[in-house]
Amino acid sequence: MITIKSFEFNYFQENTFLLYDDTREAVLIDCGCCRKEEEKELTDFILENKLTLKHLLCTHLHVDHVFGNGFIYKTYGLKPEANKQDVEKLPSPDEQAKLFGLRQHVENVPVEKYIVGGEIIKLGTSELQVLTVPGHSPGSIAFYNKKNGFAIVGDALFAGSIGRTDLWGGNQEVLVAAIHDKLLSLPDETVIYPGHGPETRVIDEKFNNPYL
């Protein structure tokens, strides 16, 4: 059984997800913490629940989703894992921050491992399947667990909306096609955990999302 703990971090109210199972092994997805109190909230939870952090995963490499990568590397020695397309086609996090008018320096921790569609990532005795959902960014991916019926989708799909496509390498036609192909094809009751805002379900987005 996978437990999902969500945190709302940084100026963009980004959802950071910490997943762990009965083995107490954990993966961190889209670490967006950028303030001392946010870093403490995250590390306190990991410590109090006796978790061992095994992976730092990224659905995509926009700055609001990677603010905390430097902190995680310094604290736990983990480097991010992400899709190669984002590594090659997006500006560095610090460059992105400046373009958004942010004064805070964002450390660019090199991606240690490229993640590809169809790959299986181990989480204790559980698994996460990688789904490719480009369009919001060239290398956007999602993490799906069939047994527990959920997908962590980054900024590809939201409750009642979809990701913006006016940033580096974004493409609305590609995004909508990827959502239909990879996300709406999942079982109707699959819970969707987006990068911002509340969770939703596949069936709700099939019938209620005006962008699809």
Per-region residue spans from a language model:
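Conserved beta-strand hairpin/beta-sheet module of binuclear metal-dependent hydrolase folds
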Residues: 1-49, 142-154
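Short Gly/Pro-enriched turn/cap motifs at secondary-structure boundaries
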Residues: 7-8, 104, 110-112, 132-134
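Residue-level detector of beta-strand structural context in well-folded domains
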Residues: 17, 113, 118-119, 141, ...
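Residue-level marker for buried hydrophobic side chains located in beta-strands
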Residues: 27, 57, 80, 152, ...
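Short catalytic-loop micro-motif centered on adjacent basic/acidic residues
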Residues: 28-30, 55-57, 130-132
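Metallo-beta-lactamase
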Residues: 33-34, 96, 126-212
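Active-site HxH/HxHxD metal-binding segment of metal-dependent hydrolases
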Residues: 34-39, 43-122, 208-211
